[in-house]
Swiss-Prot record:
<protein>
    <recommendedName>
        <fullName>Small ribosomal subunit protein uS14</fullName>
    </recommendedName>
</protein>
<keyword id="KW-0689">Ribosomal protein</keyword>
<comment type="subunit">
    <text>Part of the 30S ribosomal subunit. Contacts proteins S3 and S10.</text>
</comment>
<dbReference type="GO" id="GO:0019843">
    <property type="term" value="F:rRNA binding"/>
</dbReference>
<dbReference type="Pfam" id="PF00253">
    <property type="entry name" value="Ribosomal_S14"/>
</dbReference>
<dbReference type="InterPro" id="IPR023053">
    <property type="entry name" value="Ribosomal_uS14_bact"/>
</dbReference>
<feature type="binding site">
    <location>
        <position position="43"/>
    </location>
    <ligand>
        <name>Zn(2+)</name>
    </ligand>
</feature>
<dbReference type="GO" id="GO:0015935">
    <property type="term" value="C:small ribosomal subunit"/>
</dbReference>
<dbReference type="InterPro" id="IPR043140">
    <property type="entry name" value="Ribosomal_uS14_sf"/>
</dbReference>
<feature type="binding site">
    <location>
        <position position="24"/>
    </location>
    <ligand>
        <name>Zn(2+)</name>
    </ligand>
</feature>
<feature type="binding site">
    <location>
        <position position="27"/>
    </location>
    <ligand>
        <name>Zn(2+)</name>
    </ligand>
</feature>
<dbReference type="GO" id="GO:0008270">
    <property type="term" value="F:zinc ion binding"/>
</dbReference>
<keyword id="KW-0862">Zinc</keyword>
<dbReference type="InterPro" id="IPR001209">
    <property type="entry name" value="Ribosomal_uS14"/>
</dbReference>
<keyword id="KW-0699">rRNA-binding</keyword>
<dbReference type="GO" id="GO:0006412">
    <property type="term" value="P:translation"/>
</dbReference>
<keyword id="KW-0694">RNA-binding</keyword>
Amino acid sequence: MAKKSMVVKNQRPAKFSTQAYTRCERCGRPHSVYRKFKLCRICLRELAYKGQLPGVKKASW
């Protein structure tokens, strides 16, 4: 889990556009966040397996 102080800090608008970065909206993780879903890879995987993300299915080839 992310530090609460960092999550709160990220909610404020950045002073400059280059300072802004993405965080997972579910857990607050700063790395490997998918912009389309605003979720980190771990949360994305959990919700996809539960079937809670419409249009997402497991790939097989």
